[in-house]
Structures are given as structure tokens and as C-alpha cells.
UniProtKB/Swiss-Prot annotation:
Assembly with partners or alone: Forms a cylinder of 14 subunits composed of two heptameric rings stacked back-to-back. Interacts with the co-chaperonin GroES.
Organism encoding this protein: Mycolicibacterium chitae
Keyword Chaperone: yes
GO molecular function list: ATP binding; ATP-dependent protein folding chaperone; isomerase activity
GO cellular component: cytoplasm
Family as reported in the entry's similarity comment: Belongs to the chaperonin (HSP60) family.
UniProt-recorded name of the protein: Chaperonin GroEL
Catalytic reaction equation(s): ATP + H2O + a folded polypeptide = ADP + phosphate + an unfolded polypeptide
Cysteines joined through disulfide linkages: none
Subcellular location field: Cytoplasm
One Pfam family cited in the UniProt record for this chain: Cpn60_TCP1
UniProt-listed Enzyme Commission number(s): 5.6.1.7
Amino acid sequence: PYEKIGAELVKEVAKKTDDVAGDGTTTATVLAQALVREGLRNVAAGANPLGLKRGIEKAVETVSENLLKSAKEVETKEQIAATAGISAGDTTIGDLIAEAMDKVGNEGVITVEESNTFGL
């Protein structure tokens, strides 16, 4: 029963990561699997599940604070192109995203749809 709960949790983590960030689902899935595996191992060894939960929550808070402290604003078209290029794994796509963002502005919306038409 715990394994099924763990699998559902990992699935939910991947879905939520995709919904919120649109990227990082693999990293989130690997982290969630490790948390479930190690959590179950610790509970089986006699650890208090609520204590584990509190420890995980504190760790998440600390990591989140540190990530926010080290985060850098992406402001220029060149920075946007570089960041998007890294995320897409393709500098040409990064340049296209930067160009689109330049046209719609910081509060604009860019919709990307898959096409079955070659070259479009």
C-alpha cells in the first residue's frame, strides 16, 4: 500500500512541476522518488513519520530561501535568449523565444503549439 501511495505522490509531483514551471519534471521526479524511498526506509527502521515530515518541510524551506537568495533577474533580450536556449537545448529556439518576448513584453503571453506541418 505504501508503494502505491509513493507512486501516486511521484506522479503528482511531476504533474504539478509541469503545470507550474513547465520544466524540471525529471529532476522533481528523481527527488520525489528519493524522498519516498528514504522516507519508507526510515519509517521501517522506526523513525517517526511526523518527525520526518517536519524535517522535510524545514529542508524545503531552507532550500527555497537559498535558491531565492541566489536567483538572478533575467532582464535583457540576450539574457532571455541564453536562458531559453539552455532550457530548450537549442540556441535558435532561445533566440526565437527572446524575440517573441521582446514583442509581447514582460506581461505578455506566448502560446506555443505543436504543428504537423513540416517547416511551420
